Amino acid sequence: MEQQQKQEPGGGGGGVRVVARICPCAPPPPPPDAALNFQVAALNDPALISFIPRRPTASAATAAASGRGDGPKDKQQQQQQKYRVDGCYLRDDPNHRVFHNEVKPLIDGRGGGGGGRGGAKACVVACGDAAAKRHLFMGSPDQPGLFTMAMAQLLDSSKAIGAAVTVSSYQVLQDTHILDLLEPKNHEVLILEDADGQTHLKGLSRVGVNSIEEFSQLCCCATNQQRHHPAKDSTQLQDWGHQGLIIYVSSFDQQGKECALAKINFLNLAGYVDPKQKKNEGLALLTGNKSMHALMNVVQALNSNQRFVPYRQSKVTRILQDSLCKSKTSGSVLIACLAEDCCQDSVSTLALASRSSQVVNEQYYSLSLSAKKSSKSNMNLPTDAKTLSRTFIHKTMSMQEKNARPGFNNSGVKGGQTPTANRRTQPIISSTKKSGSSICTSIKMKENYAKPKISGRKLFCPSNNSLKEENATDVASTVVTETKSATVRIQADEVQPLVGMEIRAALLNEGCSEIGNTGDVKSSEMQEVVHCSTQELLASTIQEEDYALSNMEPENSCTDMGLTCSSITDNLVEKTPASSTLSSPKLSDRLREISNSLKLLSTRPVSVRAEKWDIECARRINTIAPEPKTPEVHLKFEQAEDPKDKLTARSTGIKKSLAQECLTFLNSANKEQLKSLKGIGDKRANYILELREESPELFKEISDLRDIIGMNSKEIKKMMSGIIDP
């Protein structure tokens, strides 16, 4: 109870508070076929509500016996049905506590004669169990409801300022019909909006209230009228609908004009009915559930600070549009009423309310902010670095998978290969991806030979040779260590023809077509460089194996000019690696070397030239002569105009042009030139010059002569005739 008293009161926050209320009254006896599967309980946290599953009903037990019961997953979901809201009122809490924490701040801060600003509005919506809502709004003989307590406070505050209190009551059926409950009429109530966005219900009556007794009678009358309304459909329950109560507080000025001070909406939302239940077949559930979903969407949009609020989805939300909003002069609260023993319908209602609560939307908002920050930090990385690292790692992993196969590392298989098989493996040794130009190839080859070839051996070409071969290569590794510098020089002179054999042949074939290329795309060039760098590392490992073998077997030396490519390949396959015991380089060193090669290639100017003959071929001239055709003559036959009309039109144009020239002359002539006109003397000329100093374009129409300098129509005609006949 102490935790419950420390809850944050409603109103003033700008959003919509969503609270739960467990009905304190004894529930009516349920029907025999009712399935009360849950018991509502509040956990240690006052804003966390749990639905504890009860023992299964007879139908559920029968289904479980027949093998159709809920599985472990369904049982786990039932045990985890916990929902968080902005506040919860237990069974022992009276209605006075709910009114003091949730409704009273709305009345005190939103007008109602208590110092609020004019035109302020508030909204109180209740949904859930019907008995719990009735006890919350109407109360019981022991404790009053929210209607009575709110009206009592409004009457006391309005008497102090001389304001009047009026009430209206309506019912919404099937989300299409709005009926007046205080004064039933044949026509329905219409929803209208003014230019300021205020909602008005046309045709809804207002009844003045001066005491609590009158208000109690009006509430009873509205309740009876609701029960006796004819159903719009045979499948529609008579009490199925949303009932609303509006309390207006207004005053009148000296002229008798009404000034709205406050408007408070109370809405009893129809209960949510699960359409999956068989007992609910035949009811018009679509419209009732639609209104609840529309209202929850509005509440969620307000609590999650969305720009668009879907008020147009339902008539209920349109009625509450001016009060169920986020502004300084409005406040709202949504109360989910629950019975202590409930069914799946109450669980669905509270699930919708929890989704729309402020605390849940604040958690989602904080999670979205953290996700945005993490995405921004990832976007700050350079794109080239991301692409390069992904490509390099992918190539490295693919090469490691290929080299991990036992068939390629078995010495027996290598020794038994035929020359044809060796020739098949030759493209893997010496072939690289074709680059855009010979400059790129030469730069990569030089940089490849300048690097120590033994350093990249273990990373890309791991071997699992036999123990005998490892012992045999110990002597070879010693020889290679002593003659390291000589080996590097020999590689640059003799092995380069072998490795670059296919590259040069490909470049010769591409020499003719290279002139016609207009340019290389930078992204494709980057990918080719990474691929070439990986192939070069493979070639370098095989080259240093070749030289290690040449030091051990002079008769198989690569310096022999009579040696064929097939014999060289056989020696390379049968050889044993000389650097299997050396440590592999770090991945960061390899990445640094590749980045340096990319920087060197980026300085190469891109060829954007194109030959003239390419342009001429692209722009082929059509030399086929067109078929001769007889020229078409379009004759326009017009009726002859009346000479009088032509003369009138031309004379009108002459008059207009003459008047325009006269006005231009009056706006630019000096004193002597003005005096040369008929009707303008010394006095008028001086007056015109004085006025022209204030506005350069003094005369814009002929009528300005009459208005400014006082010339009559006769003088104006004489002046114009004097211009024509000087």
Curated annotation (Swiss-Prot):
Keywords: Microtubule, Motor protein. GO terms for biological process: microtubule-based movement. GO terms for molecular function: ATP binding; ATP hydrolysis activity; microtubule binding; microtubule motor activity. It holds the Pfam family Kinesin. It comes from the Eukaryota. Residues 1-20, 60-82, 402-423 are annotated as: Disordered. InterPro entries: Kinesin-like_fam, Kinesin_motor_dom, Kinesin_motor_dom_sf, P-loop_NTPase, RuvA_2-like. Signal peptide: none annotated. SUPFAM superfamilies: P-loop containing nucleoside triphosphate hydrolases (SSF52540), RuvA domain 2-like (SSF47781). Residues 408-423 have a biased composition (Polar residues). The keyword rRNA-binding does not apply. GO terms for cellular component: cytoplasm; kinesin complex; microtubule. Residues 15-359 form the Kinesin motor domain. Gene3D superfamilies: AF1531-like domain (1.10.150.280), Kinesin motor domain (3.40.850.10). PANTHER family: KINESIN-LIKE PROTEIN KIN-10C, KINESIN-RELATED. Belongs to the TRAFAC class myosin-kinesin ATPase superfamily. Kinesin family. KIN-10 subfamily. This is Kinesin-like protein KIN-10B. The lineage of its organism: Eukaryota, Viridiplantae, Streptophyta, Embryophyta, Tracheophyta.
